Every structure is written in structure tokens, then in C-alpha cells.
Swiss-Prot record:
Protein name: Ribonuclease P protein component 2
Keywords of the record: Cytoplasm, Endonuclease, Hydrolase, Nuclease, tRNA processing
Subcellular location: Cytoplasm
Recorded catalytic activity of this chain's protein: Endonucleolytic cleavage of RNA, removing 5'-extranucleotides from tRNA precursor
Origin organism lineage: Archaea, Methanobacteriati, Methanobacteriota, Methanomada group, Methanococci
UniProt keyword annotation of Chloroplast present: no
């Protein structure tokens, strides 16, 4: 059985709050494709793998993206150069960067913090999806 790494040896992360201005509603898979293509076009495969982008949450037009701490400037520059998606204009605005999801939601997206156990209780009350 594998042991987990201690916190001092884990990769440091940053969380980025994004606002995507596009004339149509985008889904999570579209946002992932936009971010990966932007990184690939700007810094190539190596830069994309070092940045290690991961979409945490997305509700049109706002999203939270997890990236590597050392590659914040790489992500900023690659997203600022992105101006087209499906031959339509797109603008990606970085609202802010923090080291925790909670701070990104509260400070930049103005979403109040809700403890995780309350979210699970709400999902149990709704029942299974049909």
C-alpha cells in the first residue's frame, strides 16, 4: 500500500478565479479545452504539463482553476493571448489568485463559505439523479 506524501514534499498549488466573456454559454469541457489549448499554443507540451491545470468549479461565466505555484505567470500570459474560440471572440479575465479554494470563493467570487458536511446533507435530501 502506498503512503501519502507529507505536506512539505507535495506540489504547491494556486487557485485562479476566472471570468470568461463569450457570447454563448460554455460548459466545463469547453473551458478545459480552452485553457489547455492556450497553454499548448503559448508554452508547448512541457509548459502545459508543468502548469498542471485542473478545473475545480465552473458556473458560467466564472470558474476556479488549480495550477502549479511556479507557473502562475505562464498561465496569465497564455490566457491573455487567447482571443478566439470556435471562430468567435473570447476574453478571459483573471479576477484573482489565492492559495486556497475557500479564499478564492469568498474574496473574488463573493460566494459565502459553506461547510462540506452541509453540502453532503443537501445532496442526500435531494435524492439520486434521474
Amino acid at each position: 500500500m502506498l503512503k501519502t506524501l507529507p505536506p512539505t514534499l507535495r506540489e504547491k498549488k494556486r487557485y485562479v478565479a476566472l471570468e470568461i466573456i463569450f457570447e454563448e454559454e460554455l460548459f466545463q469541457k469547453d473551458v478545459i479545452a480552452i485553457v489547455r489549448n492556450a497553454l499548448m499554443n503559448y508554452s508547448g507540451v512541457l509548459g502545459c504539463s508543468r502548469t498542471n491545470p485542473w478545473l475545480i468549479d465552473y458556473n458560467h461565466p466564472y470558474g476556479i482553476l488549480r495550477i502549479s505555484r511556479e507557473e502562475v505567470n505562464n498561465l496569465r500570459s497564455s490566457l491573455s493571448l487567447t482571443n478566439e474560440h470556435r471562430k468567435k471572440p473570447i476574453n478571459i479575465h483573471i479576477i484573482g489568485i489565492s492559495n486556497s479554494v475557500k479564499h478564492v470563493r469568498e474574496k473574488f467570487l463573493h460566494v459565502p463559505h459553506e461547510p462540506y458536511y452541509k453540502v453532503i446533507q443537501k445532496l442526500k435530501k435531494k435524492g439520486p439523479k434521474k
